[in-house]
Design a protein with these regions (language model features):
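Short coil turns that delineate tetratricopeptide repeat
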Residues: 57, 102, 134-137, 168, ...
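Canonical positions in the second alpha-helix
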Residues: 51-52, 96-97, 130-131, 162-163, ...
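Position-specific recognition of the canonical hydrophobic site in helix A of tetratricopeptide repeat
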Residues: 37-38, 71, 82, 116, ...
């Protein structure tokens, strides 16, 4: 029995020693990768980071730097086959980093930015699916941002609407949806007539809800003003435009008053 215990302890020591050696080797190889990255040798740097990760997959900074290196490789060839592969690997690396450091905000920011930069909207939806199923407002908001920045207005509007439903007393959720609608109308003059009015009315409604929640915040008034101006463009004559422009001026003045009062 004593021999068994002694052998077991020795085995544990050997495993710990081997693990320690792997960690040291991983850090050494990662150092080589960093040098190659700074020399602009991206493919070699990526290969070295991958080698380092094999020695010790639990070093978060290696996964983070592997993500950066792959993102840089994607940016060199965004429309090519190699760029597509690098984008997928960047997402995988940042996801691995987040598994090791789930509370690190940098990882979340880098992953979201990678989804945006590489136009991987579907991958983002898949990644955030567990949180979406829980109706998590932050996940819904993040997907709204990604959809918006990848040119998917309808999807962004849907995510922001779901965020409002999930967190109805959050004025920022209402404002985000209103701003999205204003931005779309402002940049899509081809949306005309009743379609333009209906969409503007949707944005105005959620902004008025935001005003009810935070009556002293200037932003909802500012964007209500802007949406009334976009709405007025659906009309042709000055007489038709006048009611919307008068409303716009009313909310603009209120926004200015609140901004001055806040100083």
């Amino acid at each position: 029995m004593r021999n068994f215990s002694a052998n077991f302890v020795c085995a544990l020591i050997l495993v710990a020693a081997a693990s320690g050696c792997d960690t040291l080797k991983a850090r050494s190889v990662a150092k080589e990768a960093a040098d190659l990255y700074h020399e602009g040798k991206l493919d070699e740097a990526i290969a070295k980071y991958e080698e380092a990760a094999k020695f010790d997959p639990n070093i978060a900074t290696i996964q983070l730097n592997l993500g950066f290196a792959n993102l840089a490789a994607y940016q060199q060839d965004p429309k090519g086959k190699n760029g597509d592969l690098a984008a997928n690997r960047a997402v995988e690396a940042f996801e691995s980093f987040l598994k090791l450091k789930p509370e690190d905000e940098r990882g979340k920011q880098y992953l979201v930015q990678t989804f945006v930069d590489t136009a991987r909207y579907d991958a983002a939806v898949q990644y955030f699916q567990p949180q979406v199923q829980k109706n998590d407002p932050e996940a819904l908001n993040t997907l709204g941002i990604i959809a918006s920045k990848t040119g998917k207005f309808a999807e962004a509007k849907d995510w922001y609407t779901k965020r409002v439903a999930a967190d109805p007393n959050n004025a920022d959720a209402h404002v985000a949806l209103g701003v999205l609608v204003w931005d779309f109308l402002h940049n899509h003059k081809e949306v005309v007539a009743q379609q333009r009015k209906d969409l503007a009315d949707e944005g105005i409604k959620v902004l008025l809800d935001a005003i009810k929640l935070t009556p002293k915040a200037p932003n909802p008034y500012t964007y209500t003003n802007l949406l009334y101006r976009e709405r007025s463009e659906a009309d042709i004559t000055d007489d038709e435009k006048r009611p919307d422009l008068e409303k716009a001026n009313e909310y603009f003045k209120k926004a200015m008053e609140l901004q001055k009062a806040a100083k």
